[in-house]
Structure formats: structure tokens, C-alpha cells
Curated annotation (Swiss-Prot):
Record-stated family: Belongs to the lyase 1 family. Argininosuccinate lyase subfamily.
Swiss-Prot/TrEMBL GO biological process terms: arginine biosynthetic process via ornithine; L-arginine biosynthetic process; positive regulation of nitric oxide biosynthetic process; urea cycle
Protein name, entry field: Argininosuccinate lyase
Biological or metabolic pathway of the protein: Amino-acid biosynthesis; L-arginine biosynthesis; L-arginine from L-ornithine and carbamoyl phosphate: step 3/3; Nitrogen metabolism; urea cycle; L-arginine and fumarate from (N(omega)-L-arginino)succinate: step 1/1
Database matches in NCBIfam families: argH (TIGR00838)
SUPFAM superfamilies: L-aspartase-like
Subunit structure: Homotetramer. Forms tissue-specific complexes with ASS1, SLC7A1, HSP90AA1 and nitric oxide synthase NOS1, NOS2 or NOS3; the complex maintenance is independent of ASL catalytic function.
EC number(s) reported in the record: 4.3.2.1
Function description: Catalyzes the reversible cleavage of L-argininosuccinate to fumarate and L-arginine, an intermediate step reaction in the urea cycle mostly providing for hepatic nitrogen detoxification into excretable urea as well as de novo L-arginine synthesis in nonhepatic tissues. Essential regulator of intracellular and extracellular L-arginine pools.
PTM: Acetylation modifies enzyme activity in response to alterations of extracellular nutrient availability. Acetylation increased with trichostin A (TSA) or with nicotinamide (NAM). Glucose increases acetylation by about a factor of 3 with decreasing enzyme activity. Acetylation on Lys-288 is decreased on the addition of extra amino acids resulting in activation of enzyme activity.
Active site: H160, S281
A Pfam match: ASL_C2
Amino acid sequence: MASESGKLWGGRFVGTVDPIMEKFNSSITYDRHLWEADVQGSKAYSRGLEKAGLLTKAEMDQILHGLDKVAEEWAQGTFKLNPNDEDIHTANERRLKELIGETAGKLHTGRSRNDQVVTDLRLWMRQNCSMLSALLCELIRTMVDRAEAERDVLFPGYTHLQRAQPIRWSHWILSHAVALTRDSERLLEVRKRINVLPLGSGAIAGNPLGVDRELLRAELDFGAITLNSMDATSERDFVAEFLFWASLCMTHLSRMAEDLILYGTKEFSFVQLSDAYSTGSSLMPQKKNPDSLELIRSKAGRVFGRCAGLLMTLKGLPSTYNKDLQEDKEAVFEVSDTMSAVLQVATGVISTLQIHRENMGRALSPDMLATDLAYYLVRKGMPFRQAHEASGKAVFMAETKGVALNQLSLQELQTISPLFSGDVSHVWDYGHSVEQYEALGGTARSSVDWQIGQLRALLRAQQTESPPHASPK
């Protein structure tokens, strides 16, 4: 049990800890987020102790009742922290002793804060991953719904930020939705590796008192049990994986935000953000700034920093638990909060975005059909490399004459290749252009419909695979 100072350690120490060191060592300001998981883990462990004969039934019931009271105080906001509560485990155990007396001292039998904290963190992250998964799926669903509703809108596709080929607006939306679907799949995979029980590993060597880890696993609804006690208390792969997942997801969201910021400028005027997701200027009254998208873009860097910071912490550690690992929780909590906010804002932006179809259509230009002109010659039997060169000559001729590509006469085109004939006029139809890309994954209407169907099926499958995780007993 806690020493007279309220610490969970003591006996071999003399004197008091420097107040600056007290503050430096404390983590209660942020690991208090784990209060519910800490109570859940302690309740399961008390049942394990009772089964092992280390608690009587009456003692277990007393502890369980006390833990329920601790949880109630946290939930109602009445839990009072003590200056000596260096972390959530100290705080909860101290309060439990105040409520039920010395019996509380038996709860920590055979348990270390090393296996306790990593169990708490896994419980918290498992639940949080379910929440983030639901938010991410809602964003993808919103994007798919929008793509389905606006399938007939055409606009320029860009490579190197240069106009490339006509595509469907839906094709652009779906390109980002597909990337986010991979993020959704990765999150479920990360959660599976989070869902492994370390409790019962002790500080390093394991549990010598006959505690049934399979019972603990079932009580806390974990999918598996850790294989090695040294690894169980010190590995933070699951934290690094989560932070990397968030970094990659933010990469995708940042790229989408960058596209929309560009498309929303007066120079493009393809889209307009809702006032609900924009702000103004304190000096220039005409300004409508895409702050929602800019913050999504900037917060990507913040998340990357947390991921890199944790990896730098982990790479130099010797085996088993070290206090450095206290740094993992702040990173997890901050990134989780950031991801929750970003996903909700992104969903709001997409669902309320206004598109300017006319401007999108006006931005299409005949030079974007140069590739189609080459394909026209390919269909006439010309090898693609020759067709590419012939189309390039047509582009050069149009530029030299100061006219649009589709303004070249048939006679002028035939000076480049005799394969050009009257049906070349079909090349200059933007609708015809996009419809030729019928191969799966392309921008033709049939292919876009197929993509929408595939994404809806993936969302249904992921919803089945990732039901809301029930709280442990």
C-alpha cells in the first residue's frame, strides 16, 4: 500500500522529494484521462486475486464496491486530487483506501504499475480507436454520397499543378475517399494489436501468485494475452503504430485540404466553403479565409511531431520499463483529440461545400484533349509512340498559329498524319473524353459507379468488423 507520504513506493527512501522533482515526475495532469480504464483493470484484477485465493469473497466485494464509488466520483466530477497523487494509479488507490480502509492495500498484490499502466493505456486506446473508426467511416460515407450525387460534373484533372485531362468531379472526391479507406483498414489492424492483455506480467518477471491471466483477459474482453512479461511491460509498438496511422491519415487529409484551398481561390473558383467553416480578416472586409482547411493542413505537422518524438524516445531505451515511457500518454491523448476534431471538421467541410459547375466546365480546354488525339490515332492503327509525337506536333502547330487545338482544320491535321479524318471531331467532346476511360478505376460513369459500389461495400464490411467496443465488466 502507499507509504505515509502517499507514494506507492517508499521504505528504502529517507527524507522528502524536491518539490521541483515532484512536479517533474508527476503525470496526473494528463494520465487522469485513464481513470475509467484504471478502475476497470483494478476490478478485473481483484477478481483474479479472489480466484487465486489471495482475497476473500468479502474482501473482493468490498474492493469492487469501493472502486465503483471511485468511478462514480470521477464521472460526477467530484473526485478530489491530492498533492501527493503523482499519477492516476496513486490517486485511485489512495482514494480507495480512504473509502474502505486497509483492505485496499491487497489490491496491488503481485501487480506493478508497469503492467497496470500499459493495461490502462490499451483499454483506453481500444475504445478510442472504435470512436475514431466511426468518425473516419462517416467522413468516407459523406464523400461517397457526394460523389454519387455529382457524378455528371466534369472539371480539369491536374498533374504537377498543370491542367492534364478532363475528369469527373466525383473521380477526384473518390481518389481521396479511397486513400481514407486504407486508413480505416489500418486503424482496425492497429486496434487488433492494441487488444492484447499485458496485466499479470508484474514489473518484469511475471506473476508468482497463481493469478489466472486467462480470467483477466476474459474480464477485460481482450483478444489475446501477451507472450513475454518483459516485452509486455515495455513495448510501445502499439502506440507508435497508432501515431503512425494518425500521421498517414493526416497526410491524406492535408493533401485533400490543399486541393480544396487551391480550388477555392478566385483564380480557380471551383468550390466555395460554407461560412460555418470559414473565417474573415480583421483588416480586409472582403476576405473569406479557409481556416478549417488550413488548420487541418497544419495539424498534420503537429501529429507528425508526436510520432517522431515517440520513436526518438523508444530507440535509445534498454530492455523493460523505463520512466521515459511516461511520455507515450501525452502523445496519444493529444493526437487522439486532434484526430477527432479534424475528422469531424473535414466531414462538415465536405458535406457543406458548394461547387461552381459552370466555372469547372469553363476551365476545360481543348489542349487537355491532346492525349485523346493520340488515342484517336492509336485506334486507327498507329503505334502509341508515333501517335504521341503526332499529337505533340498538333499542339505545337496550334500554339504557333495562336489557336486552340480543336481549331486546327482537318487539312492541317492531315499534314501531320493522313490517318486523321472527319471523325476526329468526336475527340473535342469532353463528355466523350471521360467516357472512354471505362477500365475499372477510371473516370467513366460506369467506372465511377463501380468505385462507389466498392467503397460502400467496404464501409459495410468495416462496420461489421468494428462494432462499438463494450466496456469491460
